[in-house]
Amino acid sequence: MFGNRMLVYWRDQALPAYLATAERWKAADPATQPDEHLLAGMRELALADARYWFACALMIARAKVTDALLGRFLTMAAPGRSLTSGMFLRGFPSPTVDAETELEALAGQVRGSDELRALVTTTPAPNLPEALEGTSAGQAWLDAFSRYLERYGHQVYNLDFVAPTQADDALPVLLSLKAMVQQPKGDPRARQRAIVAERDARAVETARSFDPLRRWLFRLLLGWAQRFGPDRERALFYMGAGWPTLRRLALELGRRLVDGGSLVEQEDVFFLETSEIEAAIAARAIGKARPDLARQARERRELREARKRLHAPPVVPPDHRLRFGPFDMSVWETQRRNEPDGAVLRGFAVSPGRVSAPASVIRSPDDFLEMEPGTILVCSTTTPAWTPLFSQARGLVTDVGGVLAHGSIVAREYGIPAVLGTGTATTRIRSGQAILVDGDVGTVTLLDGTDEADAAQRSPEPEPKRHSFPSTKKVTIFAIVGAVVAAWWRCWRRS
């Protein structure tokens, strides 16, 4: 089957090639490399990551297609029951759960030591490494923490290598650790087993509620989605695996160019093009400087900061709906359209459950210290390096994202309700404001001092779905398509 070939390509070719490139340059000492070799390493690692991203895109595509088929089927075959594909795509083994389990073990070591517990609970997270270095027990714990970062610290805050990785900036991990020490939530594996039991029971109950035709199609689509969905997170875990090494090479080169007078800060090197870096290296080789490159880097840095204030619309023009011929393709959108005022924001229901709590609005990693344990995390979007914040959150709301976004997958594994793709959550919600997140229907209610019962009364029903012809007819068509695809699948497997 083509899907199997994509898996083999990712697992046996793309991933090993990427990791081999990253390991080869990781073994090189940046301080001893010539300037030209540092630039060559940066370029090779960036290209290797780009090639790996193509393999990731294949894994994402097959997960997204099978998820969309399951989600659309549930909408048509069980209208009004608020069934979402995310309810059935939970509890699978993943690097996210592995990382949380290891971090919980580290937190357990702290809880088991009076000395460490006192240090961790009384020291601000940014100062923890320095405080722990002052004791033998603390140093031993830091050694274990370093091994944790060696395995998981490559995770990125965004796809731009100008941003530090988790290994470069471990603040969110330390914040999560403090929360785990002060407010233990139990064994992540036990929570995962409970999620699996709930998921499987819901699948059995849902299958029983359908007639034979719908039951067959539900099981077919569920099998595809559950087979391909978990591969997405495994593939994405390695995105940015070369970034820590690339950054070390770049910062060493940047340091040399600062010494040579061509740059003002090490990080300026990230804002130069390849030809400009080559020119700076050539100038340094003959004892000259290129101060014009420092000005160029400063202007580009300022432009990058200015662009952070922009909010991209879901589609252009904004009132356009994604369509392919006669087919509505809005299932692929990553933002819902919401009115600029009103008490309810609509988004995508991606992780089931319902919770009300104050919000912590976190716009970037610079705001991580403002995350309050026991609140609902509200942000533009999340990437793997944001994962440690989930252990402190009771729910998740984002501006951008859908059922297969990183945040939705992690929220389901943490068992917290999530509504993604509201478009305007970070501008409509303020930190400390009470909100109600309904991950079953995809709404976020701004409570404004009202209690949850009042909010439930004024919270709207799920948005009605548009049906161009009866649901039974749609399900029949789905069954025909499913039969054709199943036959194609069997042919591929025999070939």
Where are these regions (language model features)?
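Acidic, glycine-rich flexible loop/linker segments
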Residues: S360-D366, E370, G374-T375, S380-R466, ...
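Juxtamembrane/start-of-transmembrane alpha-helix segments at the extracytoplasmic/lumenal side
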Residues: S468-K474
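Hydrophobic alpha-helical topogenic segments used for membrane insertion/localization
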Residues: K474-W492
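Mature hydrolase/peptidase catalytic cores and their serpin-fold inhibitory cores, especially
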Residues: P317-G374, V378-C379, P384-T387, L396-V397
